[in-house]
Regions:
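A cross-family signal for N-terminal binding/gating loops and helix N-caps
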Residues: 1-129
């Protein structure tokens, strides 16, 4: 049986959730992300696509990008936009797009379970993809 445990998440305070929320980093390139954050200083894209806050000629995998991501995450936290839950929890979420609803549960899993295929990899969770 796979290990699946609650954890203390770091997340936006409710009043800032809409401002921090962003599309996933891997659905847009750096230029699209730069455009998406115009006028949105709290967007999480400043953390998970931090090259947008550096000169355009910086390689997205350069160490300076990771340093900038850390700086931006710390700024969100230190300026009071994020909170960490006091007690471990499981987190339920629902995404709705084009009339389809998808519900999920977030918790902590064991890396050993992942590496030993106790947990199915994201790409192989449907029979038609195996």
């Amino acid at each position: 049986m796979a290990v699946f445990q609650p954890f203390c998440a770091v997340r936006p305070k409710p009043q800032y959730a809409r401002d921090v929320a962003a599309l996933p980093y891997d659905v847009m390139n750096s230029e699209e992300a730069r455009e998406a954050v115009q006028g949105k200083p709290l967007s999480f894209l400043h953390v998970d696509k931090a090259e947008i806050d550096l000169p355009r000629d910086v390689d997205p995998y350069d160490d300076s990008v990771y340093a900038k991501a850390r700086e931006n995450l710390l700024a969100l936290s230190e300026n009071g936009y994020l909170l960490q839950d006091a007690a471990p929890c499981f987190y339920l979420y629902r995404q709705i797009m084009d009339g389809r609803s998808q519900t999920g549960l977030v918790g902590c899993a064991s890396i050993d379970d992942y590496l030993n295929d106790v947990i199915k990899k994201h790409e192989f969770t449907r029979a038609d993809k195996e």
